[in-house]
Amino acid sequence: MALPFSLLMALVVLSCHSSCSLGCDLPHTHSLGNTRVLMLLGQMRRISPFSCLKDRNDFGFPQEVFDGNQFRKPQAISAVHETIQQIFHLFSTDGSSAAWDESLLDKLYTGLYQQLTELEACLSQEVGVEETPLMNEDSLLAVRRYFQRIALYLQEKKYSPCAWEIVRAEIMRCFSSSTNLQQS
């Protein structure tokens, strides 16, 4: 079952505005890349989330990291970069390749890699401008612990289809939040 059109359009609108206010020179295609990653994550759904209600889990999403008011641009970019890097790593595991359509997974890797490359170029521009640390150590740890909890959950659930569906939906929410941070 596909994502409802209204939800998909909301995700597209949110991600289209994501790179407009960053303090560096991201290519105009960056926001399209965000949209593409969200759409790919939506297309990757293989089973109904309703059949997996018993597997739901609170991964402790670090919302405070993604509240844009506390960050300057370099810290926000760094938080988004770390999040995308962790998503890339999560979907690069052995258990992931068995769970998803290989073609969609390859497209997701490509999209995430492109986002990482663009953000790294942006970070290198920002490092020369500011001397403040790129990302608060507590924020970095919060993001990494969040993804560790997700990885542990998958391991405990033996990488079941329902576990991956729960994680896919969580990653869509996480990616959308990190995208929103870019526009703050």
Curated annotation (Swiss-Prot):
GO terms for cellular component: extracellular space. Pfam families: Interferon (PF00143). Residues 1-23 form the signal peptide. InterPro entries: 4_helix_cytokine-like_core (IPR009079), Interferon_alpha/beta/delta (IPR000471). GO terms for molecular function: cytokine activity; type I interferon receptor binding. It comes from the Eukaryota. PROSITE patterns: INTERFERON_A_B_D. Disulfide bonds join C24-C122, C52-C162. GO terms for biological process: adaptive immune response; B cell activation involved in immune response; defense response to virus; humoral immune response; natural killer cell activation involved in immune response; response to exogenous dsRNA; T cell activation involved in immune response; type I interferon-mediated signaling pathway. Keywords: Antiviral defense, Cytokine, Disulfide bond, Secreted, Signal. It is found in: Secreted. Interacts with IFNAR2. Belongs to the alpha/beta interferon family. Produced by macrophages, IFN-alpha have antiviral activities. This is Interferon alpha-2. It comes from Equus caballus.
